[in-house]
Amino acid sequence: MNTIRNSICLTIITMVLCGFLFPLAITLIGQIFFYQQANGSLITYDNRIVGSKLIGQHWTETRYFHGRPSAVDYNMNPEKLYKNGVSSGGSNESNGNTELIARMKHHVKFGNSNVTIDAATSSESGLDPHITVENALKQAPRIADARHVSTSRVADLIQHRKQRGVLTNDYVNVLELNIALDKMKD
């Protein structure tokens, strides 16, 4: 009988520790010391939430930087979202897959050797909010033309928002860069 009582007590103590106290402690630590990160790293502009630093968005206007292609279309298809819920992930297609090749041709004019790899391929999560500085600099002339500013001004904006990669190329956050474009004075 003593063994059963000890087992029940240990089970209750473990449930309280692991199911209540530990999650409560982690939540409190997150909210006190890492409030921005614990709440999605949301970005506000003009007093409204426009996105997250951590999730890419689908940009199509010529006056904005375009992010990487997304294998999950940044969850922008409402019908798929309703049926499948929010998801992330790569396509898991091989380099010879005809659907992948067709998608790459859609994102890039094939035969153009002036395209960076991140402009043609999706990230592993399919939601990457960053592009390489090289990719951003190659988009700068298009954006400068659309906004009627010099390419060097757009390039300076890119350089000021550059983040250093440890084992990767330098990169920029597309949403933050596009907000900076909108804030740019003529």
From Swiss-Prot:
Its main location: membrane. The keyword Cytoplasm does not apply. InterPro entries: KdpC. It is a single-pass membrane protein. GO terms for molecular function: ATP binding; P-type potassium transmembrane transporter activity. GO terms for cellular component: plasma membrane. Keywords: ATP-binding, Cell membrane, Ion transport, Membrane, Nucleotide-binding, Potassium, Potassium transport, Transmembrane, Transmembrane helix, Transport. It is found in: Cell membrane. The chain crosses the membrane at residues 10-30. HAMAP family: KdpC. The system is composed of three essential subunits: KdpA, KdpB and KdpC. Part of the high-affinity ATP-driven potassium transport (or Kdp) system, which catalyzes the hydrolysis of ATP coupled with the electrogenic transport of potassium into the cytoplasm. This subunit acts as a catalytic chaperone that increases the ATP-binding affinity of the ATP-hydrolyzing subunit KdpB by the formation of a transient KdpB/KdpC/ATP ternary complex. Belongs to the KdpC family. This is Potassium-transporting ATPase KdpC subunit. It comes from Staphylococcus aureus (strain COL). The gene is kdpC.
